[in-house]
């Protein structure tokens, strides 16, 4: 959406991308609102479910990381890193600073999405916490397959042992990885396991881990 072309891309543009998009534009919205604008109040059903009143004001939606930046107190010339399953690096700039420039390499440049009346700028990586979760699942496999199916323990003991071991994987890796001097680390990774958000977003890219030797350990890979 951009006001320079009257909102959403034209029907011609969309059908050039894919003929199946014919007629799609006419069924979409025509107007956008920033998240500071109230759109209504809480319905009786949700007020009851949440234990709130129907006087609670409901605002429009926005990107989670953009709202995270608002919560962190983002202002012009400050940089906020919102870290979770992925990472989002968020800044805001005035219209005068941005002008008609399109900032290259970043994944988002949105008028009013972070702070109304300013341009929100977003970069980051598509995988962060998700990568830790993936590596944990890799290391969990033998625990669940071998210990979890062992005949040496009863079912309750197997479940408790597997659960305890799985829960301790990330803390144990963290403690050992902290002991490794940065100059001794020969393992290099491109963290694109979920594609690349910045620079130049490409969600089809894959991650790599290089520099592995027979001496590479789980903490060093971590």
Report the location of each language-model feature.
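Active-site core segments that coordinate phosphate-bearing ligands/cofactors
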Residues: 1-23, 33-222
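Thiamine diphosphate
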Residues: 29
